[in-house]
Amino acid sequence: MKTYKGYLIDLDGTMYNGTEKIEEACEFVRTLKDRGVPYLFVTNNSSRTPKQVADKLVSFDIPATEEQVFTTSMATAQHIAQQKKDASVYVIGEEGIRQAIEENGLTFGGENADFVVVGIDRSITYEKFAVGCLAIRNGARFISTNGDIAIPTERGLLPGNGSLTSVLTVSTGVQPVFIGKPESIIMEQAMRVLGTDVSETLMVGDNYATDIMAGINAGMDTLLVHTGVTKREHMTDDMEKPTHAIDSLTEWIPYI
């Protein structure tokens, strides 16, 4: 079995299930830490800051620091800064994306911004959509942190960022650049942070459509763990198979 020098790890469904602890995840990450294998938690959640994400992981007894968290907000801000280092950005979104924009030396703009970024915004208003549409029509480049149409909550499935993004797409006729999983952009950014090559990095996740496809799109090896969204019975012959598939992260510990 191939030994990997770095791990990119999904959160919900892989490290925990909502508010429920996954015991095997704790042992898995502790083993990575004890053996000195670098790892980075990669999430499509654009609303939380790295510290907030790390604090939640620690509450589940999973070893994590904010430096070991890579959010779609961070990937989005870095992507924009690479395009134009002093760009102005009109942001629809919450604390996570706004903090990432500031930390990358970008400024906030309005109808004449260089970029429009859409992240999940649970206080969305018509005016926010209106300014975003006007900026795009004025030539702003259109970026979306991720295309998740719905997000699971205790109440059930609620509108995700892809749903918000679609309002601007339909109104302007402009398709955004998506950053988060299953796109390769967030994976490439994360590997730069981790400092490992694509051939020696493993993507670990529970959701075939986002986590595993992100790894496949980035040319990475993938490990599908059936503790969340995608069960064994969901896999069909016409789907590109993950490199590895397991029922519990405990099964992978001997290969770390």
Swiss-Prot record:
It is an enzyme of class 3 (hydrolase). The gene is yutF. SUPFAM superfamilies: HAD-like (SSF56784). It comes from Bacillus subtilis (strain 168). GO terms for molecular function: metal ion binding; phosphatase activity; XMP 5'-nucleosidase activity. Its cofactor is Mg(2+). It comes from the Bacteria. The keyword Magnesium applies. Homodimer. This is 5'-nucleotidase YutF. Belongs to the HAD-like hydrolase superfamily. NagD family.
